[in-house]
Design a protein with these regions (language model features):
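Metal-dependent enolase-superfamily TIM-barrel catalytic cores that perform enediolate-based chemistry
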Residues: 2-111, 116
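Glycine-rich beta-to-alpha transition loops that act as phosphate-gripper elements at the mouths
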Residues: 71-77, 103-104, 123-130, 153-155
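Conserved sugar-transfer catalytic core signal across GT-A, GT-B, and GT-C glycosyltransferases
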Residues: 86, 132, 161
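C-terminal structural cap/anchor segments
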Residues: 154-172
Length: 176
């Protein structure tokens, strides 16, 4: 779900409208951007974590309980401690995975997120080698590896990353 608008209300309401449309079209899963702050904040928005939670709650309510919801916060927080202050309370939203809560090179934070967050953790879209993925999977303990075929060395390397993920009981989803 890709938002539009230049205010918090427009942003939230556009994501709710997209969620309702996805539901009406019979989608079984959706990934929603929720970028109200951080390096990739939508239209320069600068909202607090309570507002981020408000958007997640509104999208989940619009989708209902039977559609998988994935949330991409695009490096919203500086570390796991900061992220967990918010996402520990998101269990009620039944999020399938949380994408890129912190910068991908913060392996320690990813491991902590895996251990303490109430949802799967996904990352990897900017990684360029299978060796980086191996580190993120083994030491960062991510649940979902997300290679971007155009960055990770092509389809052959993406397949190797997928195989490594599978061998380590992790999911691998091509990043879109």
């Amino acid at each position: 779900l890709q938002p539009v608008g230049h205010s918090f209300e427009e942003y939230r309401d556009s994501l709710v409208a997209w969620a309702e449309k996805a539901k009406s079209l019979g989608f079984k899963a959706v990934k929603s951007e929720v970028t109200l702050n951080g390096p990739y904040a939508h239209s320069g928005l600068n909202e607090n974590d309570e507002r981020t939670t408000e958007v997640v709650a509104a999208v989940r309510k619009a989708l209902g309980p039977d559609i998988y919801l994935m949330i991409d916060v695009q490096y919203r927080w500086k570390d796991a401690e900061e992220a967990l202050r918010t996402v520990k309370d998101w269990a009620e939203f039944d999020i399938y995975f949380l994408e890129t809560p912190v910068w991908t090179d913060d392996i320690k934070s990813y491991a902590q997120m895996h251990d303490e967050a109430p949802m799967k953790i996904a990352a990897g879209e900017w990684l360029s080698t299978r060796y980086e993925f191996e580190d993120l999977i083994i030491n960062g303990k991510i649940d979902v590896a997300q290679p971007d075929v155009g960055r990770c060395g092509g389809l052959t390397e993406a397949k190797k990353i997928a195989k490594f993920s599978q061998d380590n009981n992790r999911l691998s989803l091509i990043h879109i």
